[in-house]
Structures are given as C-alpha cells and as structure tokens.
C-alpha cells in the first residue's frame, strides 16, 4: 500500500514545473531527480539492494551513450549518429585505469554487442562495473534505437555505504502526467526493494536541477 497519494504528487509536480518553466526558465533541459533518504537500515549489516526498472517516459532524452560493438553494430551506430568503439579501440586503452575511468566518465551509459559482452571484463577490467556502467547487451536482431531508448528509460536504485541516493525520474519538458507516472512507479519499485518497505523510507523529495526541493514524504 502506497503511503503517498497521486493527488499530492501531482500538486508538487505542478508547482515544480511551474517554477522551472515559468518563474525561472533556464536555457537547458533541467532533470528532475527523486532524492531518497532511508532509515532503520544498516548498510554494513543489511543486504545492499540493487535493482533496475524501466520507466514509461524517458527521464533524460539527451543522455550520452557509447556502443562497444562488433562491425555490424558499429555500422548501425554510425548510421544512427551514435558514438561507438570497436574491440581494437578498447585494446588501445591497454587496461590503463586512468583511461578507462575517463571513458566511464565521458558517457552516461554503454551498450555492447552480445558477441562482445563476455570480453568486456578482459578488455577493460572492472572499471565500468565500478562506475555502475556495465554495458547492456544488444543483439543483431534488436532494433538499436529501441534498445537505446530502453537504456535511457531504465533507472537503477543501488544502496552503497550511505543512506541517501538520487535517481533521475524525469525532466521539466515532460507533461505533468508523464512525470507523475514516472515518479509513482519509481517510488513503488524502490519500496519493493526495501527490507521493511515503507518503514525504511525516511524521506522522499523531488527536485529539478535548479528548483527548490519539494518534499513528498
């Protein structure tokens, strides 16, 4: 049972969109983040959860993605104007931790050809996994644009050592209903990951990049 009503979330979303689109309009697309504070959770003792869910609307349409591909997928990427790297490009990094870190920082996410996915740890070591950006596999039969949109609309909740986290759930260019739909799905999924459900939720806040925060819970 959700502790937050859709009506309450809708009101906060309306205020947030009004502020970002009318009161203080910025010259870039602001991301809307769901900020979560947990309670009664011990990251040392309790299981550190990790889970991903696909949202109905893409939170960050301009997210940067790089394809680590075989020739077929590199050709498809070029055709679609998407950055791509071949096995040879990856070999040139020579497992250099600094260069791999730089690569992980340059892109928001990675997609890799199915044929290549098993070679990634051997070619790049644990660098991408450590950054939480291990590639999503794509097969030749997958529609590449569809796969990229799937990656763009998937968010990840991962508990590390601290009891707070933030995930992008939308942007200020969305309609109110799109944003409310994304937020409700994200919250309900997060609660399903928690050991004691709502009893582990300390606070939930939404905030656009440059807007004041709105406390939902």
From Swiss-Prot:
One of its GO terms (molecular function) is RNA binding. Pfam families: Ribosomal_L1. Disulfide bonds: none annotated. InterPro entries: eL8/uL1-like, Ribosomal_uL1, Ribosomal_uL1-like, Ribosomal_uL1/biogenesis, Ribosomal_uL1_3-a/b-sand, Ribosomal_uL1_CS. It comes from the Eukaryota. GO terms for cellular component: cytosolic large ribosomal subunit. SUPFAM superfamilies: Ribosomal protein L1 (SSF56808). One of its GO terms (biological process) is translation. PANTHER family: RIBOSOMAL PROTEIN L7AE FAMILY MEMBER. This is Large ribosomal subunit protein uL1. The lineage of its organism: Eukaryota, Fungi, Dikarya, Ascomycota, Pezizomycotina. The gene is crp-74.
């Amino acid at each position: 049972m959700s502790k937050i009503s859709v009506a309450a979330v809708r009101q906060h979303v309306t205020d947030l969109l009004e502020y970002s689109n009318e009161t203080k309009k910025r010259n870039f697309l602001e991301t809307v983040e769901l900020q979560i504070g947990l309670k009664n959770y011990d990251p040392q003792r309790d299981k550190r959860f990790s889970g991903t869910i696909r949202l109905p609307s893409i939170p960050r349409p301009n997210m940067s993605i790089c394809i680590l591909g075989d020739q077929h997928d590199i050709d498809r990427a070029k055709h679609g104007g998407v950055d791509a790297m071949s096995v040879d490009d990856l070999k040139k990094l020579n497992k250099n931790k600094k260069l791999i870190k730089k690569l992980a920082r340059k892109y928001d996410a990675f997609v890799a050809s199915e044929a290549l996915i098993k070679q990634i740890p051997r070619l790049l070591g644990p660098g991408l996994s450590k950054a939480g950006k291990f590639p999503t596999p794509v097969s030749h039969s997958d529609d590449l644009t569809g796969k990229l949109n799937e990656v763009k609309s998937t968010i990840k909740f991962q508990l590390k050592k601290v009891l707070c986290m933030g995930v992008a759930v939308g942007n200020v260019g969305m309609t109110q209903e799109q944003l409310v739909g994304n937020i409700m799905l994200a919250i309900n999924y997060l609660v399903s990951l928690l050991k004691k459900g709502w009893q582990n939720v300390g606070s939930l806040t939404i905030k656009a990049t440059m807007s004041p925060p709105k406390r939902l819970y």
